[in-house]
A protein has these predicted regions:
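A structural signal for short loop-to-beta-strand junctions that line the ligand-binding cleft
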Residues: 56-58, 84, 146-148, 204-209, ...
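Surface-exposed binding/hinge segments that line
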Residues: 96, 132-187, 356
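Mature extracytoplasmic/periplasmic domains
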Residues: 361-381, 554-560
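N-terminal lobe/hinge region of extracytoplasmic solute-binding protein
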Residues: 34-88, 124, 199-202
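Acidic glycine-/aspartate-rich tracts in secreted/extracellular proteins
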Residues: 41-43, 100-101, 164-165
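Extracytoplasmic/periplasmic ligand-capture domains
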Residues: 1-20, 24, 70-72, 91-92, ...
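Long beta-strand-rich cores associated with HINT superfamily self-processing modules
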Residues: 558-585
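Residue-level recognition of beta-strand termini and adjacent short loop/turns
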Residues: 87-89, 151-153, 213
Length: 585
C-alpha cells in the first residue's frame, strides 16, 4: 500500500469521553481456556525449523525453550543451559546442557530427550554462517557473533566467537532477547525437513494442539509435570487469535469474545482498570526513522570474506539527498546529506505524535536505542521541533541531488525532493500504529515542502532489501534494539555493520559504529560498556542516522472476571511472555 502524504495529519479530534468507562462483561469464551487476541500479521503456520523462520516467540509462549531466562535483576537464570565458561582471551565459550529433558510427543512420535546435539543443530540451522539459506529472524545476528556450534558430547557445547559480545547470554540465547528455539535433531533426521517445517517438536511446558494458518493456534499443557517445576502451567489450555485491527481487538475484549487483548494506548484509555488489568513484559517499542542506504564500510568486517572488498553499493548509484556517498557525488556529499537528515529530523513534532496517536501515554524518543527516562540521559541529544529551521537548513545546501517528482511551488522551491517512508513490521506493521507514525512523519515532511509517500507493503517483500543492502527508503522501525527495556550499556549497532552481511540490517553501515559496537561488546565491565554506548549516542546523533519519534507502550489487558492473574517475566524482545504464569479465576 502506498499513500501520498500532502499535509501533516490533523491532530485527531479527541475522542469524546464515554459517559462511563468500559466495564468487564461476562465472557463468552469456553470454560477452562484463556483466549488472547494479539496484533500483527505474522502468526503464520506451525513451523518447527529455525532456518525456515519458525516463530521467534515459541520460547516466550512456552512451546519451546532456549538456554537462559532473565532474572528480576537482569542477570541470567539457567534454563536448558546449566552454566558456561568463557576463554580468558574471549575467543570461545563452553556451555553445559541440562540432561533428561523430554521432547514433546507429536503425532504419536516420541523423539526422546534433549542433548547438546539438539542445541548445536538448532543454532547451526538458524545461523546464516552455517546455513546460508536461513531466514531465521536473527540469522545475521548469529553470523556476526559466532561460527559453528559443536556438541562435544551429550552435555557440552563449544563455539568460537566471531565477535565477542558480553551480553550474548542475556540476549541471543535468552528468553528475554532475540534468541533461538531448541528443536529436536532426531525429528529432523527421522522425519525430514518438510515434516518439521509443519510440526513443532520442542521441550516447553505447552505444546501445539491446533494451528490454523494466519488465524489462531491453541496450546495445551503437556501430560505430566514439566521438568522445571516453576514453569508448570497454571492454565490447561490457551488460544492465541490473530486480530490485526486494533479497534477490533478492543471490541472483542469489550464484548467478552476474548479474555485478553493487546490494546493500543488510545483504546486502553477507554477501559475501567478496576475491571481490567494491564500486564506487559516491561517494554515499550521505540519507533524512529532509520536513514537506509548510507553504506560507509568498504570491506567485510568478519566472516569468510573478512578483509575482502564489498560488492558495488547499489544505494550510491543515484545522488539521493539523505544518503552520503563518500567521493561519488562531490566532496561535500557526506556533510550535505548529514544536514538534510537533520532537517528531516527536526521537521517532526514528536510531542504531537505522542499526544495524537498514543493518547499521551507513550514517550518521546529523540535517538533510537536510548531511553530519555534513563539517568544516563543528559538532554544534549534532543531534536527540537523546528520546521522553519528545517527549511533553512535544506535551502543552505547545494541542490545537486536527485529531486524526483517534487514540485517547486512550496517553501523549498528548487530544493524540494521526493521521499518515501516505509512502515516497518513492529506492532503489526503498516496496518497498526507503526503505519500511523509513518503517515505522520510523511505529513511533517510534506509540511516543509517535500513530496512524500508512506509505504505499507508486506515486510516479507521489504526485508530482502535490507538483507541485500539495497534499500534507500527511510523506514519507521525499532531496528533490533529499539526497546525501552534494553539496558543502556547493552551493545548496539551490530546490525549497522558488515558483520551481519547476509542477514538483517538497519540499512546503513559505518566503520565508526563497527568500532564502537566492538568496544561495547568486548567491555570487561558495565562502566566501560556505558562509556562506549555514550560515544555511540554522540555519533549517531551527530550523523542524524536514527532520529527517534515515539515509544509505544506494548501492553495487554485482561478481563478480571475470567483471568485471575498473569504476571509476565520481563522481556526485551517480546510483548507476550511466560504464558505458564497465566491463571484463570
Amino acid at each position: 500500500v502506498t499513500e501520498v502524504a500532502t499535509a501533516t495529519p490533523e491532530a485527531a479530534a479527541a475522542a469524546e469521553e464515554p459517559e462511563e468507562l468500559i466495564t468487564a462483561p461476562d465472557t463468552t469464551t469456553p470454560a477452562g481456556i484463556a483466549v488472547i487476541a494479539v496484533g500483527g500479521t505474522g502468526l503464520g503456520s506451525q513451523n518447527g525449523l529455525g532456518s525456515a523462520q519458525a516463530p521467534d516467540g515459541l520460547k516466550n509462549t512456552g512451546i519451546a525453550e532456549t538456554l537462559f531466562r532473565r532474572a528480576a535483576d537482569d542477570s541470567e537464570l539457567p534454563w536448558i543451559a546449566t552454566g558456561f565458561t568463557i576463554a580468558p582471551d574471549l575467543s570461545s565459550a563452553t556451555v553445559k546442557i541440562q540432561q533428561g529433558i523430554p521432547f514433546q510427543v507429536v503425532d504419536g512420535n516420541d523423539f526422546g530427550t534433549l542433548t547438546a546435539h539438539d542445541v548445536a543443530f538448532s543454532m547451526n540451522d538458524a545461523n546464516s554462517v552455517t546455513t546460508p539459506e536461513s531466514i531465521h529472524g536473527q540469522a545475521g545476528d548469529f553470523a556476526g557473533l559466532w561460527g559453528e556450534w559443536t556438541a562435544v558430547d551429550d552435555e557440552t557445547i563449544t563455539f568460537d566467537f566471531a565477535a565477542f559480545d558480553s551480553t550474548w547470554k542475556d540476549d541471543y540465547v535468552n528468553q528475554s532477547g532475540q534468541a533461538f528455539n531448541v528443536f529436536s535433531k532426531k525429528a529432523f533426521d527421522d522425519m525430514g525437513k518438510d515434516w518439521v517445517r509443519d510440526h513443532i517438536v520442542a521441550t516447553g511446558p505447552f505444546q501445539v494442539e491446533e494451528w490454523l494458518r494466519d488465524e489462531s493456534y491453541t496450546i495445551v499443557n503437556r501430560p505430566g509435570e514439566h521438568w522445571l517445576p516453576e514453569l508448570e502451567p497454571k492454565t490447561e489450555r490457551i488460544q492465541i487469535v490473530q486480530v490485526s485491527e486494533p479497534t477490533t481487538r478492543a471490541a472483542l475484549l469489550r464484548t467478552g469474545e476474548v479474555d485478553m487483548a493487546a490494546l493500543e494506548p488510545k483504546d486502553a484509555a477507554k477501559f475501567d482498570l478496576n475491571d481490567f488489568t494491564q500486564t506487559s513484559a516491561g517494554g515499550a517499542v521505540q519507533l524512529g526513522v532509520f536513514f537506509a542506504g548510507n553504506l560507509w564500510e568498504d570491506t567485510y568486517a568478519g566472516g569468510a570474506n573478512e578483509g575482502n572488498p564489498l560488492p558495488t553499493k547499489a544505494t550510491f548509484v543515484h545522488d539521493i539527498p539523505w544518503i552520503g556517498s563518500p567521493g561519488k557525488h562531490g566532496d561535500d556529499d557526506l556533510e550535505q546529506a548529514k544536514h538534510i537528515r537533520r532537517a528531516m529530523a527536526i521537521a517532526i513534532d514528536r510531542d504531537l505524535v505522542n499526544d495524537t496517536l498514543v493518547a499521551g501515554l507513550g514517550d518521546v524518543v529523540h535517538v533510537e536505542y536510548f531511553n530519555a527516562s534513563s539517568p544516563n540521559w543528559t538532554g544534549e541529544h534532543e531534536y527540537p521541533y523546528d520546521p522553519d529551521g528545517a527549511v533553512e537548513l535544506i535551502l543552505a545546501q547545494d541542490n545537486d541531488y536527485q529531486r524526483g517528482s517534487a514540485g517547486k511551488d512550496g517553501p523549498l522551491g528548487e530544493h524540494a525532493f521526493e521521499v518515501s517512508v516505509y512502515a516497518g513490521p513492529e506492532l503489526g506493521g503498516g496496518g497498526s500504529i507503526t503505519g500511523e507514525v509513518a503517515d505522520a512523519v510523511a505529513g511533517f515532511w510534506s509540511d516543509i515542502g517535500l513530496t512524500t509517500f508512506s509505504l505499507k507493503f508486506s515486510y516479507q517483500t521489504f526485508r530482502p532489501t535490507v538483507v541485500g543492502r539495497s534499500n534507500t527508503h527511510p523506514w519507521i522501525t525499532s531496528c533490533d534494539k529499539g526497546k525501552a527495556a534494553i539496558p543502556w550499556h547493552f551493545p548496539k549497532g551490530l546490525v549497522q555493520t558488515t558483520l551481519t552481511r547476509g542477514g538483517f540490517s538497519c540499512g546503513f553501515e559505518s566503520p565508526v559504529i563497527l568500532d564502537l559496537y566492538r568496544r561495547m561488546a568486548e567491555a570487561s565491565d558495565q562502566a566501560s560498556a556505558t562509556a562506549a554506548a555514550n560515544e555511540y549516542l554522540d555519533y549517531v546523533y551527530e550523523q542524524n542516522l536514527q532520529p527517534g519519534v515515539v515509544a509505544i507502550p506494548d501492553a495487554f489487558y485482561f478481563n478480571n472476571k475470567k483471568i485471575k492473574s498473569f504476571p509476565m517475566d520481563k522481556a526485551a524482545a517480546a510483548n507476550l511472555n511466560s504464558l505458564w504464569n497465566l491463571e484463570l479465576q
